[in-house]
A protein has these predicted regions:
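Short coil/turn segments at secondary-structure boundaries
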Residues: 23-27, 35-40, 60-69, 90-98, ...
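Structured, non-catalytic alpha/beta "coupling" segments that mediate domain-domain communication
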Residues: 41-55, 124-141, 281-292, 297-299
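Catalytic adenosine-cofactor/nucleotide-binding cores of aminoacyl-tRNA synthetases and other
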Residues: 1-71, 269-270
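Conserved structural-core and active-site-/substrate-pathway-adjacent residues in large, well-folded domains
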Residues: 16, 51, 95-98, 132, ...
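C-terminal low-complexity, glycine/proline- and small-hydrophobic-enriched intrinsically disordered tails
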Residues: 35-42, 146-304
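Flexible loop/turn segments at secondary-structure boundaries
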Residues: 7, 21, 29-34, 91, ...
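Core structural elements
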Residues: 25, 46-54, 68-107, 197-200
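Acidic, turn-prone loop/beta-hairpin segments
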Residues: 64-80, 98-99, 103-177
Length: 304
C-alpha cells in the first residue's frame, strides 16, 4: 500500500524466506491488503527461532507430570489447524500453531521424552507447508527419515482429547492470573505463595445457588435452612454475594477435584510463578486469608 513499501528481497536476506512467508500468511486477511509491520516480522522471526530451539530441548525422562495435558492440547491443535487449512484460513492456523508452541515451551520441564518429541514433530509437520526450510531442518534434527514436505499430515486422535483437561487448565490459568495480580499488589519480596482451596461449606452454598439460578430470591432461604451452611461465619454475606452474582456463576467443580488438580500441578505453578507454591485446604491455614477463597477461585497468600 502507499506509504508502506517494503522490498521483499531485502526482507528475505535479513530474516529468511520462511520468516517472510510466515509473517505474510499470519498478517494477511482475505478482506484487506497486507499491512506490513516491522514488529510483526520480528515476532515471526523470534517465533521460528523459538520453535527450532525446542528440537534441542527434548527431555530425557520417559514420563512427565503434564503429558496428558500436553497431548490433549496437541490433538486439539491438530484438529483445529487441519480444519483451518482446509478452509484456507491460514492466518488463524498460524496463530493456533504459535499458541501451541508457546504452550509447549511452557511445559517442557513437565513433559516426558515421547510426549515432547511427538509434539515437536507434529508442530514441524503443521508448519511444513508454510515454512518448508526450517521444517526440513527440524525434521532432520529430530532424526526422522525422508522429508517433512512429503510426510503424512498429522492426524488427531479423539481418544487423546478430554474436556476435563480443558477445565483443569482453566482453573490453573485463573489461579496463576490471580497469584500474579496479588504478587504485583503486594510488591514485597516473597518467599512462598500459599494457595488455599475454598472451605467446603462454600461449595454447598454455591450448589444451592446454582439450583436456584432461575429464582435467586430463594438462595438465602435455602442456604439458611442447610445445616452445613447456616452455622458458618459469613454465610449470610456469602448468600448475598451469590445472589448478586448469580448470572456469572459457572458450573461447580467438586472441592476434592479442585484440590487434586492444583496439588498435582504444584511444581508447575511454582515454575510459572518463579516462587515456591504450596496448595492447601483452607483449614490448614492461619488467619482470614485462608478462608477468602471461593469454589473455582482459591485464596492467595504471599508469605514474605
Amino acid at each position: 500500500s502507499v506509504g508502506n513499501v517494503v522490498d521483499p528481497e531485502e526482507m528475505v536476506k535479513k530474516y529468511g524466506a520462511d520468516t517472510v512467508r510466515l509473517f505474510m500468511l499470519f498478517a494477511a486477511l482475505p478482506e484487506k491488503e497486507l499491512d506490513w509491520s516491522d514488529e510483526g516480522i520480528e515476532g515471526a522471526y523470534r517465533f521460528l527461532n523459538k520453535i527450532y530451539d525446542l528440537v534441542g530441548k527434548i527431555p530425557k525422562t520417559s514420563k512427565g507430570s503434564r503429558d496428558a495435558y500436553v497431548y490433549n492440547r496437541l490433538h486439539k491443535t491438530i484438529r483445529e489447524v487441519t480444519d483451518l487449512m482446509e478452509k484456507m484460513h491460514y492466518n488463524i492456523a498460524v496463530s493456533k500453531i504459535m499458541e501451541f508452541a508457546t504452550y509447549l515451551q511452557k511445559n517442557k520441564e513437565f513433559s516426558g521424552k515421547k510426549c515432547f518429541t511427538d509434539s515437536v514433530k507434529n508442530t514441524c509437520l503443521m508448519l511444513a507447508p508454510m515454512t518448508p526450510h526450517i521444517a526440513e531442518e527440524m525434521w532432520n534434527k529430530l532424526g526422522e527419515k525422508g522429508f517433512a514436505s512429503v510426510a503424512a499430515w498429522p492426524v488427531w486422535d479423539k481418544k487423546m482429547i478430554n474436556e476435563k483437561f480443558d477445565v483443569a487448565e482453566d482453573l490453573i490459568e485463573q489461579t496463576l492470573k490471580d497469584a500474579n495480580a496479588v504478587k504485583y499488589l503486594v510488591r514485597t519480596k516473597a518467599k512462598q505463595i500459599n494457595i488455599y482451596i475454598s472451605p467446603e461449606w462454600k461449595y454447598f452454598a454455591k450448589e444451592i445457588a446454582l439450583k436456584n439460578k432461575k429464582d435467586p430470591k430463594r438462595i438465602m432461604f435455602y442456604m439458611m435452612k442447610d445445616e452445613r451452611v447456616k452455622r458458618q461465619d459469613g454465610a449470610a454475606r456469602y448468600a448475598v454475594h451469590l445472589t448478586k452474582n448469580i448470572m456469572q456463576l459457572k458450573s461447580l467443580m467438586p472441592q476434592k477435584e479442585e484440590y487434586n488438580i492444583l496439588k498435582e500441578n504444584e511444581k508447575f505453578l511454582s515454575y510459572d510463578l518463579e516462587i515456591f507454591v504450596k496448595v492447601m485446604h483452607a483449614n490448614e491455614g492461619i488467619g482470614d486469608r485462608a478462608n477468602r477463597g471461593e469454589p473455582g477461585k482459591p485464596g492467595i497468600e504471599i508469605v514474605s
